[in-house]
Amino acid sequence: EPNLDFQFGKYIHIKFMLSNWNFIDKEIESLKNKIINGERVATPFSILSLIDSPNLHRITAKKFVEKQYPTSNSLGPIIKGPSNKKIRIGYYSADFRNHPVANQIINLLEKHNKSKFEIFAFSFGKKTNDEMQKKILNIVDKFVEVSSKNDLEIAKISRELKIDIAIDLMGFTQGNRHQVFAEKCAPIQVSYLGYSGTTESDSIDYIIADKTLIPEESQKHFSEKIIYLPNSFMVGNINKKVSDKIFTREELGFPKEGFIYCCFNQNYKINPKIFKIWMKILNNVKSSYLWLSKSS
């Protein structure tokens, strides 16, 4: 059913995951034209890696959120009660486990000033009990397991816990619960880290970024107000131990001599134009090799 909402972009995205580039230029050109014509042809996540156009990202997100996540008033306006002694910050994610997002925010959670802030983690994902999840459980003031709750229930729980600032770590990535924010789970709602594009949602007030991620000239393509962090918006995990094991070229399947180029991104981020450039480099550098991650 190629004419189903948002499916054409998903189809092209899957082709990139398989490194199937047959007719890809023609299909992407068709995708661009369909977006410009106002058709619902792609999800915001799929379009980020397919087309380098903040304006088309914005148009796609707007079409998507209007259809999938309409702003709701089911719980009514948030009634401001007595202020908490501490500001309550809620982080919302399905990835409080061994996952790149958790690895990025673990130090952030540790560095919050506990005399001024209370930290809540709302988990949409399964309980893994892995090392990272256990660390997060020990760091936050309250770990709220809500994977079995519906979106309205999660928003209601957030209000009952009087969350002041809700931080969505997912955007439109897999496993997201964006409708929680459409139900207005907190007075201030922020997008951070997991998704770098605009949501075009009335529900998200701010996005945290830096001027490399969102240059000032790109602000017009974002519905959110942009909070710029100095230098980098990414925190990183400074406590992560680096392996002290020394790997040999031979055990990894490489000859003793030669330069090894690496790209461990997922396949869908590699396009024919980039790959052609890589092949030119390999052609011009004697005894050079390209090491890719096998993801398909």
PLM regions: where:
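Composition- and surface-driven signal marking solvent-exposed, interaction-prone regions
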Residues: 103-105, 274-278, 290-294
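C-terminal amphipathic helix plus adjacent low-complexity
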Residues: 253-255, 265-267, 280, 291
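Short, surface-exposed connector motifs at secondary-structure boundaries
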Residues: 115-117, 160-163, 259-260, 284-290
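Short hydrophobic signal-anchor/transmembrane segments that target glycosyltransferases
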Residues: 108-115, 272-286
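A generic structural signal for short coil/turn motifs at secondary-structure boundaries
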Residues: 98-100, 269-271, 293
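Glycosyltransferase donor-sugar binding loop
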Residues: 122-128, 289-296
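Alpha-helical solenoid repeat scaffolds of the TPR/TPR-like class and their adjacent stem/linker regions
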Residues: 1-253, 266
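Charged active-site motifs of nucleotide-sugar-dependent glycosyltransferases
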Residues: 84-88, 255-262, 288-289
